[in-house]
């Protein structure tokens, strides 16, 4: 009888362990799916920001940080993680990250990195618009990645605050491979259309 009971207990323990393992696997899969969906949203807004700013350049690069962080993007990313934000809360978060981008020197640093790369291929007349557009897209990408971290951590920036999260994603995005891949796409999606538009205007 004891052996029989022990065997049943062992079986029950094994079933519980398997259920927990399946639960953990399911959670990991859900987390992965959420992150992929959130990244797709950020990618979409990256190129929206780039296109809008390239078409209508801003009077100063200092405004790029604010222009790059869209409250609607924040709301959509939050929604992926099951969080419903009010428009006001999303705008506050967007403003906070926009200011952080400027305060950490990420805006000017990004413009410098992108300007150096694009100046090799572009005439001066197009350069300003192209740099602003591509930089806006790149900043949107950094801001979006920062928000994904924020919502993954249950709306918590962590011990280092928003500055640490933004700085980390800035550092990740300026690594050679990541930056090169982004710029290759930017040339195709932002710079080439600008050049085509300029050719059409020529007499």
Pin down the residues of each PLM region.
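Short, mixed-charge aromatic SLiMs
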Residues: 24, 93-103, 162-175
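Transmembrane alpha-helical segments and their cytosolic interface motifs
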Residues: 30-69, 95-107
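C-terminal end of P-loop GTPase domains and the immediately downstream helical coupling element
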Residues: 1-46
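Short hydrophobic membrane-inserting alpha-helices and related fusion/pore-forming segments
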Residues: 51-64, 111-135
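Acidic, carboxylate-rich catalytic segments that either coordinate divalent cations
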Residues: 132, 144, 148-203
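Hydrophobic alpha-helical transmembrane segments and adjacent short intramembrane/lumenal linkers
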Residues: 79-118, 125-129
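Conserved, well-folded catalytic cores of nucleic-acid-processing
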Residues: 5, 77-80, 100, 104, ...
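Membrane-interface alpha-helices
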Residues: 65-94, 132-157
């Amino acid at each position: 009888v004891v052996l029989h009971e022990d065997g049943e207990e062992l079986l029950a323990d094994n079933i519980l362990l398997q259920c927990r393992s399946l639960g953990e696997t399911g959670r990991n899969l859900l987390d992965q799916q959420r992150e992929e969906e959130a990244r797709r949203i950020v990618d979409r807004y990256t190129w929206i920001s780039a296109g809008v700013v390239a078409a209508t350049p801003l009077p100063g690069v200092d405004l790029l940080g604010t222009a790059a962080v869209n409250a609607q993007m924040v709301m959509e990313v939050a929604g992926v993680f099951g969080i419903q934000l009010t428009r006001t809360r999303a705008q506050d978060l967007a403003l906070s990250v926009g200011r952080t981008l400027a305060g950490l020197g990420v805006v000017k640093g990004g413009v410098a990195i992108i300007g150096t790369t694009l100046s090799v291929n572009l005439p001066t007349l197009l350069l300003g618009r192209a740099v602003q557009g591509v930089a806006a897209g790149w900043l949107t990408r950094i801001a979006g990645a920062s928000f994904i971290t924020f919502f993954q951590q249950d709306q918590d920036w962590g011990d280092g605050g928003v500055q640490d999260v933004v700085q980390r994603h800035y550092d990740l995005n300026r690594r050679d491979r990541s930056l090169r891949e982004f710029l290759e796409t930017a040339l195709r999606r932002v710079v080439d259309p600008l050049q085509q538009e300029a050719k059409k205007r020529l007499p």
